[in-house]
A protein has these predicted regions:
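ER/Golgi luminal nucleotide-sugar-dependent glycosyltransferases, focusing on the catalytic module
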Residues: 1-360
Length: 360
């Protein structure tokens, strides 16, 4: 039997709660998982309006060919007879490697490419300059492990299709990507191969894999069998988030409604949720598998990935030998881009831009 006893009082739990609130305020974001972004109805309607305009324009015109007459871009640039490459930068931070990309673009004719930037509007980003100036498209928030990254890529595709009918290839680029060859080398690779194929359709360069130890968990990330009947497990694919698509495949992406209904659903198992790595490979594998190479032009090192992020290269690793190694592939083609590089790699990369990177 206790010698002393204290009267119970509601004051003690009240004080405890009040003292806990500041702690929860400061530590909560680091303890609780972030709320996943979902696709809102207004955002969906905005995108559908954009997609419908791009679809209507694309279907009213022929696919870009070398004999097309000169046209004028909706952003004001004058097009030429030759097909173009649309470089689409998807970023949620500053474009740290803009100076390197400037060298890449400045070594070729400005009428052979267009640039489009989707920059997360919730993050303050240093305004791009030079050839990147005024290239940010109307953008919306993005978040990892959410369908917003799919929406951003589709938004870029539709904008580029609507802007210039001569955009024949659409290369999705990360802010952590660097070029591994000159623009002329890339251009020749994409379009000379087309000539060698005797005017057959262009091929899309997108990784499409049907085997992965995590595939089943990712397929059920939204709940068991939620993806059916639109996508059965044997149709589910995985691939790189970054790709180089033909115009006809870009059109298929923005026309799609059926698969999007499932891929836009929020994930229950966030750790297995990488929608952007599955939507594009799955859709194009189902729609036109023979029109895709099933490999990407972007080299990524997954040997020591951390929390779903690939190996990040730092300045001590940057060398001419690294560039030559990153170009190598298991096929007859060469990789054209590489990621992931830390921002402080810019200086050593710029030092060997002319002598190594753009010397093909």
């Amino acid at each position: 039997m206790p010698i002393f006893s204290y009267p119970s009082s509601p004051l003690i739990p009240t004080l405890t709660l009040l003292l806990s609130l500041p702690i929860l305020f400061f530590l909560g974001p680091n303890i609780l998982p972030p709320r996943r972004l979902t696709i809102t109805a207004p955002d969906e309607l905005d995108d559908l309006s954009l997609f419908q305009k791009a679809i209507a324009l694309s279907k009213s015109q022929s696919a870009p060919k070398s004999h097309l007459p000169s046209t004028k871009s909706r952003l004001g640039s004058t097009s030429t007879f030759r097909p173009k490459i649309a470089f689409m930068f998807l970023t949620n931070s500053d474009l740290h490697f803009q100076p390197l990309w400037e060298v890449f673009f400045n070594k070729t004719q400005p009428n052979l490419y267009n640039i489009y930037i989707h920059a997360d509007p919730s993050i303050r980003i240093k305004p791009p300059t030079g050839v990147f100036a005024d290239k940010i498209i109307p953008s919306k928030r993005t978040q990892r492990s959410s369908p917003t990254l799919i929406s951003a890529a589709r938004r870029l595709l539709a904008t580029a299709m609507l802007d210039d009918p001569l955009n024949a290839y659409f290369a999705l680029i990360s802010q952590h990507c660097i070029p591994l060859h000159s623009f002329n080398y890339l251009y020749g690779f994409l379009f000379d191969i087309h000539k060698l194929r005797k005017n057959l359709d262009y091929l899309s360069y997108i990784e499409i894999l049907s085997e992965s130890e995590f595939l089943w968990d990712r397929y059920n990330a939204r709940g068991e069998n939620v993806m059916t009947p639109e996508v059965h497990f044997d149709q589910f694919r995985v691939g790189s988030q970054f790709f180089t698509l033909t115009r006809r495949h870009a059109l298929k992406v923005i026309e799609d409604r059926r698969l999007w209904r499932k891929f836009k659903l929020p994930c229950i198992n966030v750790e297995s949720c990488y929608p952007e790595e599955h939507y594009f490979p799955t859709l194009l594998s189902m729609e036109d598998p023979n029109g895709c190479t099933k490999y990407t032009l972007t080299r990524v090192n997954w040997t020591d990935s951390v929390n779903g992020h690939p190996h990040t290269y730092y300045p001590p690793e940057v060398s001419p030998q690294l560039i030559h190694t990153l170009r190598e592939s298991n096929s007859s083609y060469s990789y054209m881009f590489a990621r992931k590089f830390s921002p402080d790699c810019l200086n050593p990369l710029m030092e060997m831009a002319d002598s190594v990177i753009f010397k093909d």
